[in-house]
Amino acid sequence: TATDISADALAIAAGNAREASLANVVFVEGRWTEPVQDRQFHLIVSNPPYVNDDDEALCALRFEPRSALASGADGLDDIRILAAECAAILAPDGWLMLEHGASQPAAVASLLSDSGWVDIACHNDLAGLPRVTVARRNVTQARSKPSETS
């Protein structure tokens, strides 16, 4: 199951899935976990927006919408939402994997820890930069539905 708030992004992803002969992917439009609240997953992989709103690189955007990259003053607004919401749709001991900026591993780990996640670890990308953090849902972590304000 793949979710995105953008119908255009989902159309591109669906085309990519067809080209890769991936017939078992379901594409659902909606914000983060909202469209899949009735499902349970063992793994969630997310490439959320993680760039600071005032990052100068955003001025050079030609193809991607700003909302696909920018996420608040520190670039972590969407990661905060995911840290809070994903436990509700993960199986016990399920895993969350988040892409983030190379300068953000400590902040992401702190957000996840504060939200009850365990076994938090950051991994380098192919360029050797710390860009992916994984965390396991603590079996005692609350499984409440996301708030309507997220």
Regions found by a protein language model. Give the residues of each.
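Flexible, glycine-/basic-rich loop-and-beta segments that form/coincide
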Residues: 138-150
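S-adenosylmethionine
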Residues: 1-138
